[in-house]
């Protein structure tokens, strides 16, 4: 997500983008504190722009090797077939899972996102949210978000259609000589042979 860089620069927070491997995948060991000291970690799962999912065991290994910093898993595309990291919240107090209604709930313009974490971490976020949140929500946005969350049938139907279309597109792209990793998002990151 391009705003991570923008916010880090705005608040003068030093950051580093760790490159993906030759298959456009995250290498968990590159995120281990003993190999790469850091003040916190943020990564998308599934990855953007590749759509590749990082397994829960790989996410857990990152958490195990970074017990003293916050690890944020951005799950903007998780509803399109990836596994959420939420089950790891019971075991790791330093995990924060963030999601959005922009993708699978079709509310991109509303700018509704949310964080899932332990009570202490959410309390810290609530303490600063009005100081740093450039996307405050008005009554219309709140009503749209609540309606989207309640409309489970539309959500399931939309996600199913996107996933079916993605799988069909993969088959058609293969016929045309394209190759790609297994996308678990609503897009395909393809290269031509």
Residue ranges and their predicted role:
Residues 13, 69, 178:
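Short glycine/serine/threonine/alanine-rich loop segments
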